[in-house]
Amino acid sequence: MANSKSAKKRALQSEKRRQHNASRRSMLRTYVKKVIAAIKAGDHKTATEAFAVAQPIVDRMATKGLIHKNKAARQKARLNAKIKAIAA
């Protein structure tokens, strides 16, 4: 338990940040899942549109520090490769 005034404040800030990050992480996963669902359905047009929406969000979360920039790059590359595979 926080004993000092500053420790109590840090605990409150930490909890607030945790909730904010959880919300952002959930949003990110939702957009990525939409792309994956379109890929599994075999719908190239919908998958491409969903990817176009998800891509800047993945980049933004990497910039904000929610995910590592390499993870963002890897995620985008894998999704794009799967979209190209269903087009062929």
From Swiss-Prot:
Record GO cellular component, one term: small ribosomal subunit
Record bears the keyword RNA-binding: yes
Top-level taxon: Bacteria
GO biological process, one term: translation
Gene3D superfamilies (UniProt xref): Ribosomal protein S20 (1.20.58.110)
Keyword Amino-acid biosynthesis applies: no
GO molecular function: small ribosomal subunit rRNA binding; structural constituent of ribosome
Annotated keywords: Ribonucleoprotein, Ribosomal protein, RNA-binding, rRNA-binding
InterPro entries tied to this protein: Ribosomal_bS20 (IPR002583), Ribosomal_bS20_sf (IPR036510)
Region described as Disordered: spans on this chain: 1-27
Pfam families (UniProt xref): Ribosomal_S20p
Annotated function: Binds directly to 16S ribosomal RNA.
Family to which the UniProt record says this protein belongs: Belongs to the bacterial ribosomal protein bS20 family.
Protein name, entry field: Small ribosomal subunit protein bS20
Species this protein is from: Shewanella sp. (strain W3-18-1)
